[in-house]
Curated annotation (Swiss-Prot):
Protein's UniProt name: RAD51-associated protein 1
GO CC entries: chromatin; chromosome; chromosome, telomeric region; nucleoplasm; nucleus; protein-containing complex
Gene name of the encoded protein: RAD51AP1
Region (Disordered): 1-78, 115-144, 162-323
Processing after translation: Sumoylation with SUMO2/3 by NSMCE2/MMS21 promotes stabilization, possibly by preventing ubiquitination. Sumoylation is required for alternative lengthening of telomeres (ALT) pathway.
Segments of skewed composition (Basic and acidic residues): 39-72, 229-247
Motif (WVPP motif): 304-307
Positions of the UniProt region annotated as Interaction with DNA: 30-49, 243-304
């Protein structure tokens, strides 16, 4: 690479008059390229300083000449001179504008909401009136629901199910009456001497049901009959309770006799056949034979023999025989200790 040749300006030292002093280097004339710093300062001092009051007076007529624009309510103009000085004020003003817009929107929405509420109230009144007319036409049933029945359409549901509910109540009442009559008839067959027979028969069910649903007088008669039925039931319970207790006692004694007497099965069979027949009789007759036979049954009970001696009694005549038992500690190897001496399993194989 060849370097380019530098252009050098020759210096004429003849201008400096060949003097050795340092003042020779200072030129009397200022070069044209450089600007003097002292000249602009002098020019600035020559100009008069404008007063602030004069500037304000000049700005005011200019603003008055320009026509003012009418702004919407709640907004105001910001002068151009105040913008750079107040930056935080702009954010606050924007926030206030947003609030005003929101308030204006809410004011506009309020009348629409009120109109909607009025329309809904009118509709609900119309629905309520129509539902009342339907209920009066179909049945005089009134719904038990106190919660906003107009909005939930509860009146319609109750109106549709009125007929089924009344029929179900009638059926339930008739079934209950029929069951009570059956129970009374069964009790009167067993204890005819002590108890009185009921005044009404099962063939009168339909008549009683119709009377029960038609008028209040028949309802009072039905309540009187119910009270009579309850009194008859109490009497039956009192009569049946001692009989049931006697039967339970006789059955428990029969079971004790069957379990205790093992040596005479034939006698047990004859007693078990005769006992059910006697149970149906009065309680006095059932107690006497049981009391007579109880000592004989106690005498025939076998004495208790311990289970360990049962095996020896069969082989020998003596009831108690001592059986010799060897302790298993000799042949058993407990643990895995190497020092324990163990007998060989096959002594013949080791000897050979």
């Amino acid at each position: 690479m060849v370097r380019p040749v530098r252009h050098k300006k020759p210096v004429n030292y003849s201008q400096f008059d060949h003097s050795d002093s340092d003042d020779d280097f200072v030129s009397a004339t200022v070069p044209l390229n450089k600007k003097s710093r002292t000249a602009p300062k002098e020019l600035k001092q020559d100009k008069p300083k404008p007063n602030l009051n004069n500037l304000r007076k000049e700005e005011i007529p200019v603003q008055e000449k320009t026509p003012k624009k009418r702004l919407p309510e709640g907004t105001f103009s910001i002068p151009a001179s105040a913008v750079p000085c107040t930056k935080m004020a702009l954010d606050d003003k924007l926030y206030q504008r947003d609030l005003e817009v929101a308030l204006a929107l809410s004011v506009k929405e309020l009348p629409t909401v009120t109109t909607n509420v009025q329309n809904s109230q009118d509709k609900s009144i119309e629905k309520h009136g129509s539902s009342k007319i339907e209920t009066m036409n179909k049945s005089p049933h009134i719904s038990n629901c106190s919660v906003a029945s107009d909005y939930l359409d509860l009146d319609k549901i109750t109106v549709e199910d009125d007929v089924g509910g009344v029929q179900g109540k009638r059926k339930a009442a008739s079934k209950a009456a029929a069951q009570q009559r059956k129970i009374l008839l069964e009790g009167s067959d067993g204890d005819s001497a002590n108890d009185t027979e009921p005044d009404f028969a099962p063939g009168e069910d339909s008549e009683d049901d119709s009377d029960f649903c038609e008028s209040e007088d028949n309802d009072e008669d039905f309540s009187m009959r119910k009270s009579k039925v309850k009194e008859i039931k109490k009497k039956e319970v009192k009569v049946k309770s001692p009989v049931e207790k006697k039967e339970k006692k006789s059955k428990s004694k029969c079971n004790a006799l069957v379990t205790s007497v093992d040596s005479a099965p034939a006698a047990v069979k004859s007693e078990s056949q005769s006992l059910p027949k006697k149970v149906s009789l009065s309680s006095d007759t059932t107690r006497k034979p049981l009391e007579i036979r109880s000592p004989s049954a106690e005498s025939k009970k076998p004495k208790w023999v311990p289970p360990a001696a049962s095996g020896g009694s069969r082989s020998s005549s003596s009831p108690l025989v001592v059986v010799s038992v060897k302790s298993p500690n000799q042949s058993l190897r407990l643990g895995l200790s190497r020092l324990a001496r163990v007998k060989p399993l096959h002594p013949n194989a080791t000897s050979t």
